[in-house]
UniProtKB/Swiss-Prot annotation:
Phenotype of the disrupted gene, per the record: In the absence of TcmN, the linear polyketide intermediate formed by the minimal PKS consisting of the TcmJKLM proteins undergoes spontaneous cyclization to form some TCM F2 as well as SEK15 and many other aberrant shunt products.
Annotated protein name in UniProt: Tetracenomycin biosynthesis bifunctional cyclase/O-methyl transferase TcmN
Family recorded in the similarity comment: In the C-terminal section; belongs to the class I-like SAM-binding methyltransferase superfamily. Cation-independent O-methyltransferase family.
Annotated positions binding S-adenosyl-L-methionine: 358, 384-386
UniProt keyword annotations, A-Z: Antibiotic biosynthesis, Methyltransferase, Multifunctional enzyme, S-adenosyl-L-methionine, Transferase
pH dependence as annotated: Optimum pH is 8.0 for methyltransferase activity.
PANTHER family: O-METHYLTRANSFERASE CICE, PUTATIVE (AFU_ORTHOLOGUE AFUA_4G14580)-RELATED
Region spans: Methyltransferase: 169-494
Function text: Involved in the biosynthesis of tetracenomycin C (TCM C). Part of a type II polyketide synthase (PKS) that catalyzes the synthesis of tetracenomycin F2 (TCM F2), a precursor of TCM C, from malonyl-CoA. The TcmN N-terminal domain, when coupled with the other components of the PKS, catalyzes the cyclization and aromatization of the linear polyketide intermediate. Catalyzes the cyclization of the first and second rings. In addition, the C-terminal domain acts as a methyltransferase.
Residue ranges of the region described as Polyketide cyclase: 11-140
EC number: 2.1.1.-, 2.3.1.235
Pathway: Antibiotic biosynthesis; tetracenomycin C biosynthesis
Uppermost EC category: transferase
Length: 494
């Protein structure tokens, strides 16, 4: 069965600049981290052939191939395909550009099928292409936005302008936009538009809503690229709205719902309390900590665990479960939720066994997950609290996935020291799957999540230097070079 990837990013720059930079083939070695050479071979009426040559891969191998590319600036589209397909039965690419709030949206779709006997199947290649595409998009975005800023650095650019006012207005109104997206998510509009454009009257009938009111909400969402308005009040899907479809593994549907729950929304009314005191506003609003509230409210707790499981799946798709785990035979996942992440590691490495430790309410949900992955016979499930119960000994890898950012430095050091005591003199590794914040002035979702940590949990996101200091206090040293956003910090005891 054929495979497909679909990724997009918004570049804060005008279309002309985005188009010119991304379609300058001979400059691609600067844009794309994996390309060493790009050469245009021949040009015809509708396009051109060009050759790409990669930098050496992890095994020292260099790859090259010829593709045909047809750019159409008028329609803001590019179509391309590989002429020399290599391990692919075929590879087709479609790029589109669209003006949206905040700049130019650049969308890349790749459709392909692997040849029988190729070293990777469609699923592995899909995961690889998604990872490299997202990384390259972020790289290209930064290059173009840096060039755009350089071009704008005139005395006039520092004066208040209509553009600056509109951007600030959009930020100030973002709370309204979040509620609009949530309402459209609850109505499953993205699912209803999955098969093509529809009139608002049809959508209102299917969702049991007031037609004019639904139109006004959809019109507002379309103004920022979430759905697109067509003639006579029809609406269609967009790359942004596709992220709201049910079952989309690359979507953000659970995040939208999570951000609009009472337990995440109400504490933001008291954010000033957190800013003035450094304490989480959650306790001021609900009278307990976030996790105490989940224990007392099982329905909210179950949703939170489902939400965390969704992000576990995203991390596996992004390759974090493949970070050299073949080295380890006994793996302890501390705070591992329902065990899905650990199960994917064990499925990939049948020689290994695992331990899953989490609070009793959470650990109780692991059985079906481990059974479905066919690894239940290789996992010990240990209900417990790693702050108060003994951390198991005798493992050669200890994992924390999305756990330590929930806690203050003081609390995080406490649990890290308990892991260090459990390791003792063993030759074990601590693997932290978490976020490393990008440098100052760069967009990074972790910088928004850091405010969640402040307001809801009393935890924090960290830059690399802060991670190093935190781990040093617990007698660990980082031995790899972590990237930004979600990444792996591999630590050895010292």
């Amino acid at each position: 069965m054929a495979a497909r990837t679909d990724n997009s990013i918004v570049v804060n720059a005008p279309f002309e600049l985005v188009w010119d930079v991304t379609n300058d083939i001979e400059a691609w070695p600067e844009l794309f981290s994996e390309y060493a050479e790009a050469e245009i071979l021949r040009q015809d009426g509708d396009g051109f052939d060009f050759r790409l040559k990669t930098r050496p891969d992890a095994n020292g191998r260099v790859w090259e191939w010829v593709s045909h590319r047809v750019p159409d600036k008028g329609s803001r589209t590019v179509r391309a395909h590989r002429v020399e397909t290599g391990p692919f039965a075929y590879m087709n690419l479609h790029w589109t550009y669209r003006a949206v709030a905040g700049g130019t949206e650049m969308r890349w779709v790749q459709e392909f099928d692997m040849k029988p006997g190729a070293p990777f199947d469609n699923a592995h290649m899909t995961a690889h292409l998604n990872t490299t595409t997202r990384a390259n998009m972020e790289r290209i975005k930064k290059i173009i936005e840096d060039r755009h800023r350089e071009g704008q650095r005139t005395p006039a650019s520092v004066l208040p302008t209509e553009l600056h006012a509109q951007q600030l207005l959009l930020l100030a109104a973002s709370g309204r936009l979040a509620r609009i997206v949530h309402v459209l998510t609850e109505l499953r509009i993205a699912d209803l538009l999955a098969d093509g454009p529809r009139h608002v009257a049809e959508l209102a009938k299917e969702t049991d809503t007031h037609e004019l009111s639904l139109y006004r909400v959809l019109r507002s969402a379309a103004s920022v690229g979430v759905f697109a308005e067509g003639p006579v009040r029809t609406f269609s899907a967009t790359p942004l709205s596709d992220g709201l479809r049910t079952g989309n593994p690359d979507g953000v549907l659970p995040l939208v719902k999570y951000n609009n729950m009472e337990l995440t929304r109400r504490p933001y009314d008291e954010i000033m309390h957190s800013v003035r005191t450094g304490e989480p506003a959650f306790r001021r609003v609900f009278g307990s900590s976030f996790f105490e509230h989940l224990e007392a409210n099982p329905e909210a707790g179950e949703f939170f665990e489902r939400f965390m499981a969704h992000w576990s799946r995203r991390l596996v798709l992004d390759g974090l479960a493949d970070q050299g785990m073949e080295r380890f035979s006994r793996i302890a996942d501390l705070g591992g939720g329902d065990g899905w992440f650990l199960a994917q590691i064990l499925r990939r490495h049948p020689h290994a066994t695992g331990l899953l430790m989490d609070l009793p309410r959470v650990a109780a949900s692991a059985g079906p997950v481990l059974e479905e992955a066919k690894v239940a016979d290789r996992v010990t499930v240990l209900p417990g609290d790693f702050f108060t119960d003994p951390v198991p000994t005798g493992y050669d890898a200890y994992l924390f996935k999305g756990v330590l950012h929930n806690w203050s430095d003081e609390r995080a050091v406490t649990v890290l020291r308990r892991v260090r005591e459990a390791i003792g003199d063993d030759d074990a590794r601590l693997l932290i799957f978490d976020q490393v914040m990008a440098p100052e002035n760069e967009w990074d979702h972790a910088k928004l999540l850091d405010i969640d940590m402040l307001v809801l949990f009393g935890g924090r996101e960290r830059v690399l230097a802060e991670w190093r200091q935190l781990l040093l206090e617990a007698d660990f040293d980082i031995v790899n070079t972590p990237s930004h956003t979600w990444t792996t910090l591999e630590c050895r005891p010292v």
